[in-house]
UniProtKB/Swiss-Prot annotation:
Signal peptide: none annotated. Residues 342-392 form the FBD domain. The lineage of its organism: Eukaryota, Viridiplantae, Streptophyta, Embryophyta, Tracheophyta. It comes from Arabidopsis thaliana (Mouse-ear cress). This is Probable FBD-associated F-box protein At1g32375. InterPro entries: F-box-like_dom_sf, F-box_AtFBL13-like, F-box_dom, FBD, FBL13/AtMIF1-like, LRR_dom_sf, LRR_FXL15/At3g58940/PEG3-like. Residues 1-53 form the F-box domain. Transmembrane segments: none annotated. PANTHER family: F-BOX/RNI SUPERFAMILY PROTEIN-RELATED (PTHR31900), FBD-LIKE DOMAIN FAMILY PROTEIN (PTHR31900:SF29).
Amino acid sequence: MDKLSQLPEALLVRILSLLSAKDVVSTMVLSKRWQFLWMLVPKLIYDDSYQAIEYGSFSRFVDRSFTLHDAQVLDTLHFKLGKTSCGTGDIRVWIKTAEKSCLRELIIEIDKSNSDNSSVVLPRSLYTCCRMLVTLKLNNAVLVDATSSFSFPSLKTLSLVSMKFPGDELIKMLLSNCPVLEDLVVKRCPYDNVTTFTVRVSSLKCLVLHETELASINADCGFVIDTPSLECLDIEDGRGGFCVIENNMTKVVKANVCNSYVHTQQLMGSISSVKRLYVCIPSSKDAYPVGSVFHCLVRLTICTCETEWLNLLMCVLRDSPKLRELKLVKNHVYRSHQPRPCWNEPSAVPECLLTSLETLEWVKYEGTEEEKEVAAFILRSGSCLKKVTISSKSTDINKKFEMLKELSLLFRRSPTCQIAFD
């Protein structure tokens, strides 16, 4: 302990910032030097699974320790709640106290697995009292109507996971008052009281929108997106609602499109500038506008769980002249009981197979006739192929050996192409 105490104060404070608030406060008994050192820690994590008996209830522990905290700037204030009955009033007091410390990051996580079913309602003061806030992450709580305007002039990162809202309008008000927002994560939950989740943010660079099959019983629910500066898009919707793109996202370089939308033309057509694309959609017909070309696409991943994956693959290969890396993977169980489509070799070899495709990775390869025909077509057409990696779904050693043997015997147009079987 003597050696530890001899370390520079800045280093000790940094070490303490890695601990929970309960453990940080406990260090005050180590020596006179440590008695006040904990008050300077710029990161406080309050986890109510740590019951501080010496301070009574969890709420009282937070009140007393937080009031004594003396750091000029509080980088992070993180609450992990759910095992005790902290209410709106408690959170209101803590947020008000944090305002005095120029709080930069606020995280509030509610764990409902160990508490009753009552929801934690966040106070309205959250909307206006933390003007220096750069990051706000909220999980499993309730936002209420705003009686006054929002004020997040410095907010760059916002995460809303399993949150409930008073309605569509609050979302619009919240996002319209985040003038420098760059990263937005939205993971919707069942009965969140939102029909159309509208994202109109001109400064946004990264957008994650996830909605599970259970997120809503209303088939009319969906998203409206207007983000002209967007660079990364991750949208997953297994419910099959809608997604309206108000303006093309010409700066998107990375996209993950995994949804059950019947119509994807507008969404896919708006990201034609993408360089890295993952796609899992139910239909290849009109998947994107006729004439669209993915001129910048160099890495493509297609999920093979959908019935139409094979036809979709051929379409995207045809319209991606600079593609270098192709990955095929089945990330989900088959989503349709319809017959699998038959393989129809295209009348013309896609340009990327002749001039640019260098690697093929196939994960959970099953060795069906259609899969073997696709593999054979790519191998005999890929002039620039360097490596083909196959990962089998089967655990049968003999079956794996037969697959490897079949693939190894296929004609390879590229003399330098190597086949690896994982």
